[in-house]
């Protein structure tokens, strides 16, 4: 009997990484992991460290597309994206990324390139290795842990969130999510109504419920994310009340006003949703998933209707806590 295989794809996107990550999510519906050599060293993953640092990466550039698949060394291995799949996506994914590069060049009038590697492993190897590597993490008051790790006896139930990162769209391990959780931890949300835009795994929606919101609406344009949110609500034994909603779609389907809105997205989507957040927000807006290079362009738009109460940064990621200006309806 043939042993089942598992495929790992490694990418480096020198420019507009968040656009490429959104494309990968929309194309594959698989979770992405942002990593670096430092992270791999922390998990003592010697095999992967050797693979990414010693292999010849393949390369595609819009300024010379005829040289596709040229093997080169990336300029650095500070940040790369890992995508894992039970299927070999090489024949479809890499050409799709190349076409996406060329479309970006045409629409943004700029050159784009990316580096990539792929390898296949026995399924039993990566599953166990991944479980051993994914450890619980504390984000302010919240203790985030996978289902295969029990919560510590001293942790309060209301502070624990169970998320399986291998199966989810987001977890507390990413800087953008952890900063959202930290900002939520400091807020008194009892008897408030909340909106989670781009709910993904549902981790922020679960945190909002644990913070005491009286009514929650969550939405995502990916049907798999909606399913994941509902699954994780059940995993955490959080009932959806009559006034709670999990919606497949964007904010255009949502009516009313919300005391707090949380949106952990990407900068381009955040900028496009400004008028919607003005329409829906009564008081506090938390934005995350913004790369430092895009922060000024986001602030230029949001200064019109919101005041910046707090700004946090972790590595290249930025999160904002905003207050809606009373003069804006």
Swiss-Prot record:
Compartments reported by the entry: Cytoplasm
Q: Identify the CDD domains for this entry.
A: AdoMet_MTases
Q: Which GO terms describe its cellular component?
A: cytoplasm
Q: Which PANTHER family match?
A: ELECTRON TRANSFER FLAVOPROTEIN BETA SUBUNIT LYSINE METHYLTRANSFERASE (PTHR43648:SF1)
Q: Where does this protein come from, organism-wise?
A: Helicobacter pylori (strain J99 / ATCC 700824) (Campylobacter pylori J99)
Tell me which residues bind S-adenosyl-L-methionine.
177, 198, 220, 264
Q: Which UniProt keywords apply?
A: Cytoplasm, Methyltransferase, S-adenosyl-L-methionine, Transferase
Q: What is its EC number?
A: 2.1.1.-
Q: Which GO terms describe its biological process?
A: methylation
Q: What is this protein called?
A: Ribosomal protein L11 methyltransferase
Q: What does this protein do?
A: Methylates ribosomal protein L11.
Q: Which gene encodes it?
A: prmA
Q: Name one GO molecular function term.
A: protein-lysine N-methyltransferase activity
Q: Which family does it belong to?
A: Belongs to the methyltransferase superfamily. PrmA family.
Q: One matching Pfam family, short form?
A: PrmA
InterPro entries from the entry?
A: Ribosomal_L11_MeTrfase_PrmA, Ribosomal_PrmA_MeTrfase, SAM-dependent_MTases_sf
Main location per the UniProt record: cytoplasm
Reactions that this protein is recorded to catalyse: L-lysyl-[protein] + 3 S-adenosyl-L-methionine = N(6),N(6),N(6)-trimethyl-L-lysyl-[protein] + 3 S-adenosyl-L-homocysteine + 3 H(+)
């Amino acid at each position: 009997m043939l042993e089942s295989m598992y495929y790992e794809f490694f990418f480096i996107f020198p420019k507009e990484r968040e656009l490429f990550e959104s494309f990968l999510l929309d194309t594959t519906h698989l979770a992405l992991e942002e990593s670096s050599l430092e992270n791999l060293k922390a998990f003592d993953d010697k095999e992967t460290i050797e693979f990414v640092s010693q292999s010849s990466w393949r390369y595609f550039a819009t300024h010379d597309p005829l040289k596709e698949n040229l093997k080169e060394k990336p300029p650095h291995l500070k940040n790369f994206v890992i995508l894992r799949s039970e299927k070999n996506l090489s024949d479809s994914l890499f050409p799709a990324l190349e076409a996406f590069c060329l479309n970006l060049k045409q629409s943004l009038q700029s050159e784009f390139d990316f580096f990539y590697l792929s390898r296949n492993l026995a399924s039993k190897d990566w599953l166990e290795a991944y479980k051993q590597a994914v450890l619980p993490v504390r984000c302010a008051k919240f203790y985030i842990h996978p289902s295969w790790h029990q919560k510590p006896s001293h942790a309060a139930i209301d502070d624990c969130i169970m998320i399986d990162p291998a199966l989810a769209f987001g977890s507390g391990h990413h800087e953008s999510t952890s900063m959202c959780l930290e900002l939520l931890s400091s807020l008194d949300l009892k008897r408030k109504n909340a909106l989670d835009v781009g709910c993904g795994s549902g981790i922020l929606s679960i945190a909002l419920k644990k913070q005491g919101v009286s009514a929650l609406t969550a939405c995502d344009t990916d049907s798999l994310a909606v399913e994941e949110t509902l699954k994780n609500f059940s995993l955490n034994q959080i009932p959806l009340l009559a006034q709670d909603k999990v919606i497949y779609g964007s904010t255009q389907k949502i009516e009313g006003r919300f005391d707090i809105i949380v949106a952990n997205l990407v900068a381009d989507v955040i900028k496009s949703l400004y008028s919607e957040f003005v329409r829906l927000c009564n008081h506090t807006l938390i934005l995350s998933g913004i790369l430092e290079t895009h922060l000024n362009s986001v602030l230029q738009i949001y200064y019109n209707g919101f005041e910046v109460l707090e700004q946090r940064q972790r590595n290249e990621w930025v999160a904002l806590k905003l207050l809606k200006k009373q003069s804006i309806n």
